[in-house]
UniProtKB/Swiss-Prot annotation:
Pathway involvement of the protein, from the record: Amino-acid biosynthesis; L-histidine biosynthesis; L-histidine from 5-phospho-alpha-D-ribose 1-diphosphate: step 4/9
Entry's Gene Ontology molecular function annotations: 1-(5-phosphoribosyl)-5-[(5-phosphoribosylamino)methylideneamino]imidazole-4-carboxamide isomerase activity
Active site as annotated: 8 (proton acceptor), 130 (proton donor)
Gene Ontology terms: cellular component: cytoplasm
InterPro entries on file: Aldolase_TIM, His_biosynth, HisA_bact_arch, Isoase_HisA-like, Isoase_HisA-like_bact, RibuloseP-bd_barrel
UniProt subcellular location: Cytoplasm
Alphabetically ordered keywords of this record: Amino-acid biosynthesis, Cytoplasm, Histidine biosynthesis, Isomerase
EC annotation from Swiss-Prot or TrEMBL: 5.3.1.16
Family statement drawn from the similarity comment of this UniProt entry: Belongs to the HisA/HisF family.
Protein name: 1-(5-phosphoribosyl)-5-[(5-phosphoribosylamino)methylideneamino] imidazole-4-carboxamide isomerase
Gene Ontology BP annotations: L-histidine biosynthetic process; L-tryptophan biosynthetic process
Primary location group: cytoplasm
Recorded catalytic activity of this chain's protein: 1-(5-phospho-beta-D-ribosyl)-5-[(5-phospho-beta-D-ribosylamino)methylideneamino]imidazole-4-carboxamide = 5-[(5-phospho-1-deoxy-D-ribulos-1-ylimino)methylamino]-1-(5-phospho-beta-D-ribosyl)imidazole-4-carboxamide
Length: 245
């Protein structure tokens, strides 16, 4: 399992939100590139970037910062989400050196878009499923649909989606612990590797998540916990590495 630090971008700064609310944000750094360096130095092997302004605007807003991080760390796998709703945006990010793009809102509203993008950019598409009580939310979590996360995952099972980033909105940024059961269920029933997001607050959460790694949970994105110091990136990754032995 990989520990994947999250860098959420808002107005050019590195922030964390509580439950996806833009008005409830905490600034953790004015220079996201410096923040990326911090996590790389701590042993991160992959970064999760989110263009929060982009998620609400429907197009990239902090794209230049994403490119700057990709240029500085050309060998570091980076995944980016937020405002990715066109082939042009995907192509621009991949050309900039990003490894994966995360399709969220559009995956719910136009699932065929994911199918098309998997064909056009094979191996580079991740689907972001943000759910509340099992139902998928869209538009920066402003809207909750009637679509069940597991059903949508099954829809993409044969499309070549690299993985699914699964966020339990109720727990994101709230330091309440990860929803292990829902994450494992999605991995098992959906048939696509899952990266858990939302609620990984300490080593205990990580150890609980590790018990379901064999279902297809391949990583954990962590944000507020590493910024507030309740989880250490190096220690967490070392623990995950030890599980292989």
């Amino acid at each position: 399992m990989l520990i994947i630090p999250a860098i959420d971008l808002k107005d050019g700064k590195c922030v964390r939100l509580r439950q996806g609310r833009m008005e409830d944000s905490t600034v953790f750094g004015d220079d996201p590139v410096d923040m990326a360096t911090k996590w790389v130095d701590a042993g991160a092997r992959r970064l999760h970037l989110v263009d929060l302004n982009g998620a609400f605007a429907g197009e990239p807003v902090n794209g230049e910062i994403v490119k700057a991080i990709a240029v500085k760390y050309p060998n570091l796998p980076i995944q980016i989400g937020g405002g990715i709703r066109s082939a042009e945006t995907i192509e621009a990010y991949l050309k900039a050196g990003v490894q994966w793009v995360i399709i969220g809102t559009k995956a719910v509203k136009e699932p065929e878009f994911v199918t098309e993008m998997c064909k056009e950019f094979p191996g580079h598409i991740i689907v972001g499923l943000d759910a509340k009580d099992g139902r998928v939310a869209t538009d920066g979590w402003a809207e909750v649909s009637e679509v069940m996360a597991v059903d949508l995952a099954k829809r993409f099972a044969n499309d070549g989606v690299s993985s699914i980033v699964y966020t339990d909105i109720a727990r994101d940024g709230m330091m309440q612990g990860v929803n292990v059961e829902a994450t494992a269920k999605l991995a098992e029933e959906g048939g696509i590797p899952v990266i858990a997001s939302g609620g990984v607050t300490n080593m205990d959460d990580l150890k609980r998540l590790a018990t379901v790694a064999d279902t297809g949970v391949i990583g954990a994105i962590t944000g507020r916990a590493i910024y507030e110091g309740t989880l250490d990136v190096a220690e967490a990754q070392a623990y995950c590495d030890s599980l292989k032995n």
